[in-house]
Amino acid sequence: MRKEHDFLGELEVADELYYGVQTIRALENFHITGKHLDQDFIKALAMVKKASALANMKTGRLNVSIGKAIVQAADEVIAGEFADQFPVDPIQGGAGTSVNMNMNEVLANRACEILGHPKGSYDIVSPNNHCNMAQSTNDAFPTAIKVCAILKSKPLLEALQRLVDELEKKAEEYSEILKMGRTHLQDAVPITLGQEMGAYASGIRRGIKRIKSAVEGAHVINMGATAVGTGLNAEPNYIHDVAYELSEVVGEPFYTAENLIDATNNTDVFADISSGLKVTALVLIKMANDFRLMASGPRCGIGELKLPARQPGSSIMPGKVNPVIAEVLNQVCYQVIGNDTTITLAVENGQFELNVMEPVLAYNLFNNLCYLKNGVNTFVDKLLVDLEVDREQCEYWLNRSVGIVTALLPHLGYETASALAKEAYETGRAIRDIILDQGLLTEDEINHILSPKEMTRPGIAGAKLLKQKGN
């Protein structure tokens, strides 16, 4: 055991631990989620500390041997070492100070070892004086959130692009499958299944653009702002250099905010990112709901789609298979929307020169980036790639619907078309059969008017027939 102290007193710390007294106090105080810090966030914060050490060495303020030891320790954390040394709860009071000091203590103790000294030799490498040099939790912590959000957005955007690509494949594959379009959950006019798939892809593409645009704001950082944004204890050269070094470490461009006070007390960039995720989730919910409805049945529903069977659906009804993959995407999106509300409240509740609610904001933002990625990948891998279409069912509903009478208006007139619709409703017969029985159009004419190409593009279906008849 070793003894460490802060201004509240002295505590014993097990020799094998790389964290110290302030982390132990956080462990005593915060038992909230039962979870540990996000591993990507630990990596992001270590990147911030590495960049800071490099910048402080450039200005000459940080001893080179100490700085190099801190950089080496940070590199080890970035590589995934010491993951078990970051045990603090992600939801905590103190605006992230417990997380910041957890990192400072781990880096300091590892740097002590690198320099040939035992852990706790804070006269050699100090968590505060060296690892936190020219920093405050109030600039290091939000900067690490931004770095992590950027890192986590990449696999999410890749997942969304996979979804777009697969939907576009389906759009091409189903381009000739005509089905009944529906508005108000009622029969409307025909549409191709390919057009529906293309529309889903278009909505997701907007989500990708929206998220990318929001994440761009995370490249503006407040490193060098220190406590309240005035830059107290941070040299001007350091403020410039730390943004450059962070860009080099992360491989992404970072820029110092024009107004460090604003960048320290406002966290609206995270609301922007969260909003992009939420709106994308809304689009995904619509798509998943449509898939579930089109797959309803199999005997007593719409039944146009055949979703892959992934597991038995009921503990009491033999042979039942449920749309579990579409359902789980729905639930993922509900969670994302709920977490967005938490993020919104956290962003709103800053006071004066700082927003102390960043820990819960970060926790929910990271979860949303992860949940949405996993939900989308699950939907693509477990549902979309193996999706099948019941073409006969699509044709069945199309032929039975009176919605196709809309396309016949230019050929038969409103009164005749209305009478056909009324008879179809009352008798249950198909519009096509009634037209043929009454000799209003030939079968070839009907097939031409009701073909996918004629029915699903701007203009009058069967316009050539009208010209031939001189109408």
Language-model features and meaning:
Residues M1-N471:
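Conserved, well-structured ligand/cofactor-binding cores
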